[in-house]
Design a protein with these regions (language model features):
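Bacterial Sec-dependent N-terminal signal peptides
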Residues: 1-26
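Charge-biased low-complexity segments
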Residues: 20-160
Length: 160
């Protein structure tokens, strides 16, 4: 009886440890979801992302539009500065974008869709750029919880 109890407890802790370390969302094809993807590519996983990031940037900023705008502007300016630093032309790109930050402020996912009025751009190249950006991104804030922002982006970014 002791062996069964010990085995059960060991199994429980091992399962909990592995579950804790595998917080990756699985895409519709059963593969781990990429860090950057086009909206509409992974519909089921997209829903899971939204559920796993329940706090909007606006809500995180205590419903303060100036603070939320400042954080969003810093993010977009950071993306633009990074594009310039690697000589990638992002000017004229307009998109709907959803950004997911982790508890520590690191980027977890970027989902996007070019707008019809955007300049013509290869989405594979744009996804590659955003993936590289997310790997080089220095968090501007540490929210202490998962945060999500749904918005649009236009480059060059023009502040108000």
């Amino acid at each position: 009886m002791k062996k069964i109890l010990l085995l059960s407890i060991s199994f429980f802790f091992a399962t909990a440890i592995f579950a804790k370390n595998t917080n990756e969302i699985v895409g519709d094809s059963g593969k781990t979801l990429p860090k950057v993807f086009l909206l509409g590519e992974y519909n089921n996983a997209y829903e899971k992302i939204q559920n796993s990031h329940p706090t909007s940037l606006f809500e995180y900023c205590n419903n303060n539009p100036d603070e939320a705008f400042d954080k969003w502007a810093r993010f977009l300016i950071g993306m633009e500065v990074y594009a310039e630093s690697i000589n990638y032309d992002i000017k004229g790109v307009k998109m709907w974008i959803e950004v997911c930050w982790e508890n520590d402020g690191k980027l977890k996912y970027i989902a996007y869709a070019p707008k019809p009025e955007s300049r013509n751009i290869d989405t594979k190249e744009l996804s590659g750029f955003m993936s590289s950006f997310s790997n080089h991104y220095n968090p501007q804030f540490s929210p202490g919880k998962r945060v999500i922002q749904n918005s649009h982006a236009s480059f060059p970014f023009l502040s108000r």
